[in-house]
Amino acid sequence: MAKKVVAVIKLALNAGKANPAPPVGPALGQHGVNIMMFCKEYNAKTADQAGMVIPVEISVFEDRSFTFVLKTPPASVLIRKAAKVEKGSNEPNKKKVGSITKAQLQEIAQTKLPDLNANDIDAAMKIVAGTAKNMGITVKD
């Protein structure tokens, strides 16, 4: 018989740097999950992606065991990295802070495709381009 899921916890953590301090500790502790075990497993799976923010979806079962699924990094993080900017514009319509090429846009869309609500790469590129526009980053040909 399948185990019953008690809670689903969503967190966005730095790859390879999960520790029991907030936000991890309180989120998992209230469901009785072994926090150190989660941190070790998460850090082991994300060690190769250091410096990125990797969202994780943790399913907690009634016997306090857990499983987790790693998602792709947020589009905004990938766009900032490609454009080599620290943060997006606070006035995206007026002040542009950087630009990315179509090739970079396609690469980001390809990375995000499994987590996006898009059927093909063109639709994914439009979604990512919209995110870039809202950050004050232009897409050049």
Swiss-Prot record:
Pfam families per record: Ribosomal_L11, Ribosomal_L11_N
Keywords from the UniProt entry: Methylation, Ribonucleoprotein, Ribosomal protein, RNA-binding, rRNA-binding
Domain of life: Bacteria
One Gene Ontology MF term: large ribosomal subunit rRNA binding
Cellular component, GO annotation: cytosolic large ribosomal subunit
Processing and modification events after translation: One or more lysine residues are methylated.
GO biological process: translation
Gene3D superfamilies the UniProt entry points to: Ribosomal protein L11, C-terminal domain (1.10.10.250), Ribosomal protein L11/L12, N-terminal domain (3.30.1550.10)
HAMAP family attached to this UniProt entry: Ribosomal_uL11
Family: Belongs to the universal ribosomal protein uL11 family.
Cited function: Forms part of the ribosomal stalk which helps the ribosome interact with GTP-bound translation factors.
Complex formation: Part of the ribosomal stalk of the 50S ribosomal subunit. Interacts with L10 and the large rRNA to form the base of the stalk. L10 forms an elongated spine to which L12 dimers bind in a sequential fashion forming a multimeric L10(L12)X complex.
Protein name: Large ribosomal subunit protein uL11
